[in-house]
Amino acid sequence: MAKILTVFYSLKGETIAPGMKIVNLEKGHTAVAAEFIQKAVGGDIFEIETVKTYMEDHMKMIYEAKEELEKGIYPELRNYPDIDEYDTIILGYPNWWNTIPTPVFNFLEHYDWSGKRIIPFVTSGGSGLGKSVDDIRKICVGAEILDGGAFLGHEVENSEQEISAWAKKCVQAQTNP
């Protein structure tokens, strides 16, 4: 049986809800989805955390993130898990400017992914995976990268059954090729 690590990057605080309404989240959408996934498939869970704190004002934060992406600035992370013992990494993140957030770029570039399976999932306002899976494939040479799953951020809290079923299907597909 494969050893699974669910890794996620998520922001809490201000975000945009449908209708361009600003809401304040105690826990980010991706964190909620990651917890559902870990509960459904087992294994361990790890949150990617940056040393710096992003701006609390959501609109300012998204432009800060865009500038990081355009300049290739990847914020320093608090720590990195030892992934050697894991066969499968379920990787969750919000869609930032049609790709993975810069902290996730940093995380991915830290490892040799040879022989690993990566199952990406994204939370977004409706833009889906964007080009994130292509970007993951470029970084994680030697890994098998599944196409991934996309979940609407504002619906995550009420989507445990859907998210869990998706995760179980992905993990089952790897154990029964």
Residue spans of the language-model regions?
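N-terminal beta1-alpha1-beta2 submodule of the flavodoxin-like/Rossmannoid cofactor-binding fold
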Residues: M1-T88, N98-T99, F105, Q161-P177
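Glycine-rich, phosphate-binding/catalytic loops in enzymes
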Residues: V23-N24, N106-E109, I136-K138
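Short beta-strand elements in bilobed, periplasmic/extracellular small-molecule ligand-binding domains
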Residues: D44-F46, A143-F151
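Short, conserved loop/helix-junction motifs that constitute active-site signature segments
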Residues: I83-D84, E109-G115, I139-C140
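Glycine-rich, N-terminal phosphate-binding loop of Rossmann-like dinucleotide-binding domains
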Residues: Y93-P94
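Glycine-rich, charge-decorated loop segments at or immediately adjacent to ligand/cofactor-binding or catalytic sites
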Residues: G126-I139
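Short, flexible active-site recognition loops that position polar ligands and cofactors
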Residues: G148-Q161
